[in-house]
Amino acid sequence: MRVLGIDPGLTRCGVGVVEGVAGRPLTMIGVGVVRTSSDAELGDRLVAVERGIEQWLDEHSPGYVAVERVFAQHNVRTVMGTAQASAVAMLCAARRGIPVALHTPSEVKAAVTGSGRADKAQVGAMVTRLLRLDAPPKPADAADALALAICHIWRAPAQNRLQQAVAAHRTSGASRTPGAAGTPGPSRTPGAPGTSRTLKGRTA
């Protein structure tokens, strides 16, 4: 499994590609940051983010894209830019038919460090250890992108099993629904509630 992790942002959009399967050693294929100038127009910045992500998709051909799920923050301007970059990342993947997964920061931290409250230094240290790197990737956005990819590789098998179980449950439930297409509805028993019968000229 080859996953492109994307830590969305307008000024710095972290990108990292990791290859491997759950339970086996993982390999970093590449890591970097797509940068845009804060002085540029918003539209131009989004185009730059799109082009940068497209370049990574062209070069590394990932089978999956993992993007950090955006949460509301006190700084509305920051969260808006992050959400816009996230949308661009998902669009780039969807346009190529690449499955996209969203992971919360706490999910990523828990998957990589064992604690959903780990700080960036701890995440960077564990990414370095798990991928057998000489030093933590810089800036932190790059390390976060690799952590996203690692998280998805480890969580994907469980998520797939859960989705399959839910789909199977829905299918079996639909086939047993009374009155469904091809399924006869319940028959009424004479004298049961909701029915009437005539007794000696009067209705019972």
From Swiss-Prot:
Gene Ontology annotations of biological process type: DNA recombination; DNA repair
Main location per the UniProt record: cytoplasm
A GO molecular-function descriptor: DNA binding
Residues at which Mg(2+) 1 binds: 7, 141
Alphabetical list of InterPro entries matching this protein: RNaseH-like_sf, RNaseH_sf, X-over_junc_endoDNase_Mg_BS, X-over_junc_endoDNase_RuvC
Chain residue ranges for the region called Disordered: 164-204
Its EC number(s): 3.1.21.10
Catalytic function, reaction form: Endonucleolytic cleavage at a junction such as a reciprocal single-stranded crossover between two homologous DNA duplexes (Holliday junction)
GO CC term (a single one): Holliday junction resolvase complex
Active site: 7, 68, 141
Protein name: Crossover junction endodeoxyribonuclease RuvC
Co-factor requirement: Mg(2+)
Function: The RuvA-RuvB-RuvC complex processes Holliday junction (HJ) DNA during genetic recombination and DNA repair. Endonuclease that resolves HJ intermediates. Cleaves cruciform DNA by making single-stranded nicks across the HJ at symmetrical positions within the homologous arms, yielding a 5'-phosphate and a 3'-hydroxyl group; requires a central core of homology in the junction. The consensus cleavage sequence is 5'-(A/T)TT(C/G)-3'. Cleavage occurs on the 3'-side of the TT dinucleotide at the point of strand exchange.
Binding residue positions for Mg(2+) 2: 68
The keyword Protease is assigned to this record: no
Membership in a protein family: Belongs to the RuvC family.
Lineage: Bacteria, Bacillati, Actinomycetota, Actinomycetes, Kitasatosporales
Gene name, Swiss-Prot/TrEMBL: ruvC
Subunit field text: Homodimer which binds Holliday junction (HJ) DNA. The HJ becomes 2-fold symmetrical on binding to RuvC with unstacked arms; it has a different conformation from HJ DNA in complex with RuvA. In the full resolvosome a probable DNA-RuvA(4)-RuvB(12)-RuvC(2) complex forms which resolves the HJ.
Disulphide-bridged cysteine pairs: none
Cofactor binding remark: Binds 2 Mg(2+) ion per subunit.
Intracellular or extracellular location(s): Cytoplasm
